[in-house]
From Swiss-Prot:
<protein>
    <recommendedName>
        <fullName>UPF0370 protein YpfN</fullName>
    </recommendedName>
</protein>
<comment type="similarity">
    <text>Belongs to the UPF0370 family.</text>
</comment>
<keyword id="KW-1003">Cell membrane</keyword>
<feature type="compositionally biased region" description="Basic and acidic residues">
    <location>
        <begin position="42"/>
        <end position="51"/>
    </location>
</feature>
<feature type="transmembrane region" description="Helical">
    <location>
        <begin position="4"/>
        <end position="24"/>
    </location>
</feature>
<dbReference type="Pfam" id="PF13980">
    <property type="entry name" value="UPF0370"/>
</dbReference>
<keyword id="KW-0472">Membrane</keyword>
<keyword id="KW-0812">Transmembrane</keyword>
<feature type="region of interest" description="Disordered">
    <location>
        <begin position="39"/>
        <end position="66"/>
    </location>
</feature>
<keyword id="KW-1133">Transmembrane helix</keyword>
<dbReference type="GO" id="GO:0005886">
    <property type="term" value="C:plasma membrane"/>
</dbReference>
<dbReference type="InterPro" id="IPR020910">
    <property type="entry name" value="UPF0370"/>
</dbReference>
Amino acid sequence: MDWLAKYWWILVLVFLVGVLLNVIKDLKRIDHKKFLANKPELPPHRDFNDKWDDEEDWPKKDQPKK
């Protein structure tokens, strides 16, 4: 078990390389063109700013300056 205490980092590197290879393999399987052709419509973004921002902050262009 002395070798495990000295070389534990090699096992970690082998594990990370395996994870990286599986990620690359899974990403190659994704067909992004097919997804983009059939992607669902997103609902409109609701941020509820319309409830408190009723006043107009910007001056109108045709209004004379004070």
